[in-house]
Amino acid sequence: MESIVVSNWKMHFSFSEACNYLNLITSLNSNLNLAKMIFAVPNLYLSGLKLKFNDTYHFSAQDVSMITESSGPYTGEISASMLKNLNVNYAIVGHSERRLLFYEDANTIALKVRNCINNAIVPIVCIGEPIEARKNKTYLQYLAQQLSSISFSFTKNVIIAYEPIWSIGSDMIPTIDDIYEVVTMIREIQNRYIPHNIENSVKIVYGGSVSANNIHQILTAGVDGVLIGKASLKLESLTTIIKTVQGLD
């Protein structure tokens, strides 16, 4: 099975810088299969980048509206149907930065996930525990609670991204055993909701300080791929990660 590699650009790059960066990645990695790469770019860039690079890469929105209507009086919102009209096939939902900075709760995230599914967009749903939950050994319960609000999605195409909050943007990373423990727990919870006659299409990726130095170890922890932040903004580290991932597939 090919590993999933999601590059989350967050609020980085001008449009011209984005085009130049993707051109460089393409030219320097012509011998690799880049079609499995998913770039989560600023929503403003989706249309232009898809026109230029749609045959080479997949693109993901970094967020989607919780509003169920396809259109209406909702200033600043971008509906799932609008993304689908651009042939965007992925959307990040519930990233810890949005949970923290924009107070997104379980109900909001569930609405966004449902909107994605109803529009044939694969949601990349982020879950993760704060350092307090890790220290007091309640992290599995914390993560299970986050998963419970989106259990309806487990029979659909969905990507679960485990990103421990305390690891994002830091030099700290869980051990391989820690990641494997969470992956196992996620699989166990999924299996409670998936009938035996339905194939499990849920994928699990790890995010949180993924780098060229630890990518090999992370991919041995039972994950289906990685969600990369700052390491994917640098050509050298992203190229190393791509080569490592494809060397293991």
Swiss-Prot record:
Is this entry keyworded Cytoplasm?
yes
Give the organism, scientific name: Orientia tsutsugamushi (strain Ikeda)
UniProt xrefs under Gene3D superfamilies: Aldolase class I
Q: Name one GO cellular component term.
A: cytosol
Protein name (Swiss-Prot/TrEMBL): Triosephosphate isomerase
Its quaternary structure?
Homodimer.
Name the Gene Ontology molecular function terms of this record. Answer: triose-phosphate isomerase activity
Q: Which gene encodes it?
A: tpiA
Would you identify the family this protein belongs to, as annotated? Belongs to the triosephosphate isomerase family.
Keywords in alphabetical order? Cytoplasm, Gluconeogenesis, Glycolysis, Isomerase
Catalyzes what? D-glyceraldehyde 3-phosphate = dihydroxyacetone phosphate
